[in-house]
């Protein structure tokens, strides 16, 4: 990787409605997976790149997001830490607008590219998928602001449709929240030995948990109202992340290649 390209320590992958990059410097990045628009800024004295997950010209649906391009762009700009934001439906009755710090995931996706290694076998270890240091920083930030949160398991579905009641009944046996974008991001980050963690906001109750019809409007409405809060949480967390990585994420790819 060209040293001149290493302009960021930390990457933020913004989900639906995330617009905290609007006043930042645009920085297009060419990757093997296409062109990615990134935004450079400084938060709490740390160099940060913000990458809108769904792009901007159009809202790319979750099953067609350029996950490889986004993670590669973060890596190519020098980021070793990645924080993602995503919206989730709750299968545990979490209040709408509340936050979940993810601690594990289950993958129900089907057709999206999920690895950088199509021509060789790489069995990357995901026994601890989310970086403990970033997760600790997120918990610190939430607690500092007196914001209630939970930790939980994330089920990722293919989308773009919402889930059926039967699917939610099945997934609720194993997971706490459900979304459409957290995988393969987390795996791709592991393949590049990056630290990765997610801050999820509950935007609705999952299908069948209430009698209310699920709509995309409620997702954008909840996230829109929480924009200022999300940015403050991320800012405090970014300032708390250790400058030197002491977690095992940096060794994720060791011994993985056949």
From Swiss-Prot:
Q: Which residues bind phosphate?
A: 53-54, 181
Note the Gene3D superfamilies from the entry: Nucleoside phosphorylase domain
Name a biological process GO annotation. Answer: L-methionine salvage from methylthioadenosine
Pathway assignment reads: Purine metabolism; purine nucleoside salvage
InterPro entries hit by this protein: MTAP, Nucleoside_phosphorylase_d, Nucleoside_phosphorylase_sf
GO terms of molecular function:
S-methyl-5-thioadenosine phosphorylase activity
* Source superkingdom: Archaea
Q: Which reaction does it catalyse?
A: S-methyl-5'-thioinosine + phosphate = 5-(methylsulfanyl)-alpha-D-ribose 1-phosphate + hypoxanthine
Which leading EC class covers this enzyme? transferase
**Residues holding substrate:** 180, 204-206
Gene Ontology CC entries for this record? cytosol
Q: What is its EC number?
A: 2.4.2.44
Say what the protein does: Catalyzes the reversible phosphorylation of S-methyl-5'-thioinosine (MTI) to hypoxanthine and 5-methylthioribose-1-phosphate. Involved in the breakdown of S-methyl-5'-thioadenosine (MTA), a major by-product of polyamine biosynthesis. Catabolism of (MTA) occurs via deamination to MTI and phosphorolysis to hypoxanthine.
The UniProt family comment states: Belongs to the PNP/MTAP phosphorylase family. MTAP subfamily.
**HAMAP family in the record:** MTAP
- The name on file for this protein is Probable S-methyl-5'-thioinosine phosphorylase
Q: Specify the species.
A: Methanosarcina acetivorans (strain ATCC 35395 / DSM 2834 / JCM 12185 / C2A)
């Amino acid at each position: 990787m060209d040293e001149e390209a290493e302009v960021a320590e930390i990457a933020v992958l913004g989900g639906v409605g995330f617009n905290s990059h609007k006043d930042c410097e645009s920085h297009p990045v060419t990757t093997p997976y296409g062109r990615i628009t990134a935004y450079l800024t400084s938060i709490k004295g740390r160099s940060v790149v913000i990458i809108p997950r769904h792009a901007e010209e159009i809202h790319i649906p979750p099953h067609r997001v350029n996950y490889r391009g986004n993670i590669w762009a973060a890596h190519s700009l020098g980021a070793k830490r990645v924080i993602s934001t995503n919206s989730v439906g709750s299968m545990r009755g979490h209040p709408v607008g509340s936050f979940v710090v993810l601690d594990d995931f289950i993958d129900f996706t089907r057709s999206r590219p999920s690895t950088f290694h199509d021509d060789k076998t790489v069995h990357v270890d995901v026994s601890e998928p989310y970086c403990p240091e970033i997760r600790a920083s997120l918990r610190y930030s939430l607690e500092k602001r007196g914001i209630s949160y939970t930790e939980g398991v994330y089920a990722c579905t293919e989308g773009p449709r919402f889930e059926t009641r039967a699917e939610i009944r099945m997934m609720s046996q194993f997971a706490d929240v459900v979304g459409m974008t957290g995988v393969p991001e987390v795996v791709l980050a592991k393949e590049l030995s990056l630290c990765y963690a997610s801050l999820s906001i509950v935007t609705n109750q999952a299908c069948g948990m209430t009698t209310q019809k699920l709509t995309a409007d409620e997702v954008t409405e909840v996230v829109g109202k929480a924009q200022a809060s999300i940015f403050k949480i991320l800012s405090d967390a970014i300032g708390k992340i250790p400058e030197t990585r002491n977690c095992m994420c940096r060794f994720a790819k060791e011994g993985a290649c056949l």
